[in-house]
């Protein structure tokens, strides 16, 4: 199913409003290797962290008429560093910075968040493609950590007669890693 442009734009607007309503410069730790991150979510040796950003937005779900369950469609978030918008995060999953660089990744490891009933899982993703010449152009791994929110509503069930899609607010810390090559 193709994502409706309007739903994505609304989710990004929601992310911008959430960012304006609370300090986007919330404490973002400097290096996730020392912040209680499970070992299986650590990037391989030789990687160095090139960026850490706060993502604020929505996890978008569609109601599957056949199963009556919410199915994940895409993320739609704004990326912040030190309170400033630096980029966006969208389907792919892709992270794109205003410096013109972007990275798309695939999930390598998925670990439940400390509160899995309300917070989406923590992830280690491996880059599948890079573009541009900025910060994300050499990224090899992405971590999604310290998530809050984003879980499909109603225990994952939906009513196909009335529910079509929903954006569930979330925040996450994204750490980007590169071997520098």
Task: List where the protein language model places each region.
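Secretory targeting and sorting signals
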Residues: 1-26
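Primary mode marks residue(s) on the alpha4-beta5-alpha5 output face of response regulator receiver
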Residues: 29-60, 67-181
């Amino acid at each position: 199913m193709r994502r409706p442009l309007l739903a994505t734009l609304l989710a990004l607007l929601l992310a911008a409003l959430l960012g304006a309503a609370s300090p986007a410069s919330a404490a973002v730790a400097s290096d996730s290797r020392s912040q209680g991150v499970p070992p299986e979510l650590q990037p391989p040796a030789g990687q160095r962290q090139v960026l850490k950003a706060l993502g604020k937005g929505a996890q978008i779900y569609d109601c599957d008429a056949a199963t009556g369950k919410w199915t994940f469609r895409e993320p739609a978030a704004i990326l912040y560093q030190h309170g400033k918008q630096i980029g966006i995060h969208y389907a792919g999953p892709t992270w794109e910075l205003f410096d013109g660089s972007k990275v798309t990744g695939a999930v390598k490891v998925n670990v439940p968040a400390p509160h899995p009933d309300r917070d989406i899982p923590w992830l280690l993703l491996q880059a599948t493609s890079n573009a541009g010449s900025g910060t994300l152009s050499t990224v090899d791994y992405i971590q999604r950590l310290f998530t809050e929110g984003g879980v499909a509503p109603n225990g994952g069930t939906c009513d196909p007669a009335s529910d079509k899609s929903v954006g569930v607010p979330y925040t996450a810390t994204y750490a980007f890693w590169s071997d520098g090559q």
